[in-house]
């Protein structure tokens, strides 16, 4: 019996080591293959940032079915290490993320990316309904599970993406919203701990 238990314990430890070794949390200068995908999409003509200002991240994550993936993200180099830290902690906690693809897979269409519940960072674009550049244009903002955590314009009631309307209202008391980010949520706490501000607290929109 002791031998059986010992063998079983060894197998468990081996499996844990395999899982740990499969984790990917890396930061790179923008590879040529990624740069080619970005040009004319998330990095259009006239973008004020330099290629050297940006970093390409590969990040392990767990989806809402518990399946593991390696996602892709482009961000400003100033926050690359912060994002590695945050998403490693989210992965370790098995915090679910629906999708993490470059917004270039959606032709840099923010609405399509959000409707697909895609977590992303850099995209050189204007704030919706404004001439001002978005913080995403500098690679300094991250949308996490944006379908479940839509942007709600306080003044007009407009919801982006529109597909997220079902998750937009009565959020404080509702328990049926998957991946809901609020001030008690791990995702919120990790981002705030690294100096980020939460869009859910904005009142100027």
Model-predicted segments: where are they?
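Bacterial N-terminal signal peptides
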Residues: 8-19
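N-terminal module-boundary/linker segments of secreted carbohydrate-active enzymes
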Residues: 23-67
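Bacterial N-terminal signal peptides that target proteins for export
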Residues: 1-8
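Intrinsically disordered, low-complexity boundary segments flanking structured domains
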Residues: 40-48, 108-110, 128-133
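Active-site acidic/histidine clusters and adjacent loop/turn architecture
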Residues: 49-114
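Mid-length scaffold segments of soluble, non-membrane domains
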Residues: 97-98, 113-147
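Catalytic cores and adjacent binding grooves of peptidoglycan-active enzymes
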Residues: 127-129, 139-205
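Charged, low-complexity, helix/coiled-coil-prone segments
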Residues: 23-35, 86, 123-137
């Amino acid at each position: 019996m002791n031998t059986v238990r010992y063998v079983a314990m060894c197998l468990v430890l081996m499996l844990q080591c395999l899982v740990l070794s499969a984790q990917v949390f890396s930061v790179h200068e923008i590879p040529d293959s990624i740069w080619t995908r970005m040009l004319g999409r998330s990095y259009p003509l006239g973008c004020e940032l330099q290629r050297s200002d940006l970093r390409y991240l590969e990040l392990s994550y767990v989806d809402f079915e518990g399946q593991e993936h390696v996602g892709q993200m482009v961000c400003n180099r100033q926050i690359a290490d912060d994002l590695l830290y945050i998403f490693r902690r989210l992965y370790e906690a098995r915090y679910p993320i629906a999708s993490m693809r470059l917004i270039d897979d959606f032709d840099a269409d923010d609405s399509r990316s959000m409707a697909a519940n895609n977590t992303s960072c850099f995209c050189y674009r204007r704030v919706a309904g404004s001439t001002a550049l978005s913080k995403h244009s500098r690679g300094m903002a991250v949308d996490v599970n944006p379908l479940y955590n839509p942007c709600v314009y306080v003044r007009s009631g407009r919801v982006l993406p529109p597909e997220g309307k079902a998750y937009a209202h009565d959020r404080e008391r509702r328990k049926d919203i998957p991946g809901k980010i609020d001030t008690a949520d791990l995702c919120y706490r990790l981002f705030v701990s690294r100096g980020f501000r939460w869009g859910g607290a904005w009142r100027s929109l």
